[in-house]
């Protein structure tokens, strides 16, 4: 078993609290609305949205994958942090035990924010994570983030 970690930062014009509410708190409803080709729906299978909650994410027709189950590991609305782990699904295939994400949204002096994301891939056996897989993961995350940002900019009264 191996562990591969990468960090990514995405700047945004959206203030941190509004971005956290849209991306994390309302994300299960907003992402499928804004990007139905990427995410078809998100269902809570167990829990109330707090730590320990299990969600099923069904991907849209534009995705190479069908669905995943993810566990909410932590959510802190005051510090604008959120952590979750993919625990099941075809994304993991025979290569990964799990994939964890740790997100923190911080304020910028210009009134916007930066979304800091740490991704941790825990591999099965001697499997390796290629640079191409990391690049694709970053591109997908950036696509979703930028689409949500564009939606919020076009709909300033949201949240």
Residue ranges and their predicted role:
Residues 1-2, 106, 132-159:
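C-terminal helix/juxtamembrane-tail motif
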Residues 21-29, 77, 146, 150-154:
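Short, intrinsically disordered, mixed-charge
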Residues 19-23, 55, 72, 115-117:
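Hydrophobic pocket/interface hotspot
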Residues 83-143:
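Beta-strand/loop substructures that line and gate deep hydrophobic ligand-binding cavities in soluble
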Residues 1-50:
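Hydrophobic ligand-binding cavity/cleft-lining segments
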């Amino acid at each position: 078993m191996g562990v591969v970690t990468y960090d990514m930062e995405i700047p945004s014009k959206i203030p941190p609290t509004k971005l956290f509410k849209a991306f994390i708190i309302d994300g299960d409803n907003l992402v499928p609305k804004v990007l139905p080709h990427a995410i078809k729906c998100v269902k809570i299978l167990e829990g109330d949205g707090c730590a320990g909650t299990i969600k099923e994410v069904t991907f849209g027709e534009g995705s190479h994958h069908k669905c995943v189950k993810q566990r909410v590991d932590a959510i802190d609305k005051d510090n604008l942090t959120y952590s979750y782990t993919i625990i099941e699904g075809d994304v993991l295939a025979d290569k990964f035990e799990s994939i964890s994400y740790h997100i923190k949204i911080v304020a910028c002096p210009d009134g916007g924010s930066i979304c800091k994301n740490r991704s941790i891939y825990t591999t099965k056996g001697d499997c390796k994570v290629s640079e191409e897989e990391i690049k694709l993961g970053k591109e997908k995350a950036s696509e979703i983030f930028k689409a949500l940002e564009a939606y919020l900019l076009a709909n300033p009264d949201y949240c």
